[in-house]
Amino acid sequence: MSPENQSSVSEFLLLGLPIRPEQQAVFFALFLGMYLTTVLGNLLIMLLIQLDSHLHTPMYFFLSHLALTDISFSSVTVPKMLMNMQTQHLAVFYKGCISQTYFFIFFADLDSFLITSMAYDRYVAICHPLHYATIMTQSQCVMLVAGSWVIACACALLHTLLLAQLSFCADHIIPHYFCDLGALLKLSCSDTSLNQLAIFTAALTAIMLPFLCILVSYGHIGVTILQIPSTKGICKALSTCGSHLSVVTIYYRTIIGLYFLPPSSNTNDKNIIASVIYTAVTPMLNPFIYSLRNKDIKGALRKLLSRSGAVAHACNLNTLGG
């Protein structure tokens, strides 16, 4: 980081959500509830997958990593937003802002790659069921997840290093509730053409290419399903990928609306609302989508509750006996 960058600005001001002061308490309670639901729901998914041996399959291996990523992704922005709403302290230090940008990009890209890996898993399961065990081996799954982490880290690091080279002069007010990369580039008084090129390249790598892979996977899945002779087989195939398809639809609809619509149709308030859906709502909904539409998850939850009930009953008997 150059001395010019260090002396130009030491902190930024986050304006937060476009809400009136009298609405702060309501929105604070709402987002706190959403964040707790996100954390607890995804932790429950991870716990169920860990405890139930029937869920030790490639699909749930990817799902457990997606749950961890959703917790982390939401934790990058929501706690800071809640703290700002509660204390009205809107300042964030320069290094803290750069760090938040890094982790936001990292977990956003990781989410995209993991969802793509899950689509590939569903493609193999439905289109090549006889070879599923030999293709989706444990080492293959680990490689897909590890590759997702490495590529996401590289993309985030590229953006962060380029961002750290920019100078920020007089204006240090960010009209957002977190340190959004696009908002930071607008504040810079340096040439951001290299940053814009990096954003375009990363969008192809981390958004469009995974989305294309998902479309191709589901295209093959659709063709295979149409060739299944029995209605029961079709329903089973659809139930296998229904939850994942719902997550893909919510995730990429928000991404496309936020980053790929023409600027003229996107006001700042609309961008903030889309970001809220992207960072707070979607990670909260994922556990419900996978649990409500998944017999394996619901079965594992019933087992966990029955075990908990049995343990509680045994503890009560011991207490009474003592």
From Swiss-Prot:
It comes from the Eukaryota. CDD domains: 7tmA_OR1E-like. Residues 1-25, 80-100, 159-196, 260-272 are extracellular. PANTHER family: OLFACTORY RECEPTOR. Residues 50-57, 121-139, 220-236, 293-322 are cytoplasmic. This is Olfactory receptor 1J1. The keyword ATP-binding does not apply. GO terms for biological process: signal transduction. Odorant receptor. It is found in: Cell membrane. It is a multi-pass membrane protein. Keywords: Cell membrane, Disulfide bond, G-protein coupled receptor, Glycoprotein, Membrane, Olfaction, Receptor, Sensory transduction, Transducer, Transmembrane, Transmembrane helix. Belongs to the G-protein coupled receptor 1 family. Disulfide bonds join 97-189. InterPro entries: GPCR_Rhodpsn, GPCR_Rhodpsn_7TM, Olfact_rcpt. GO terms for cellular component: plasma membrane. Glycans are attached at residue 5. Its main location: membrane. Coiled coil: none annotated. GO terms for molecular function: G protein-coupled receptor activity; olfactory receptor activity. The chain crosses the membrane at residues 26-49, 58-79, 101-120, 140-158, 197-219, 237-259, 273-292.
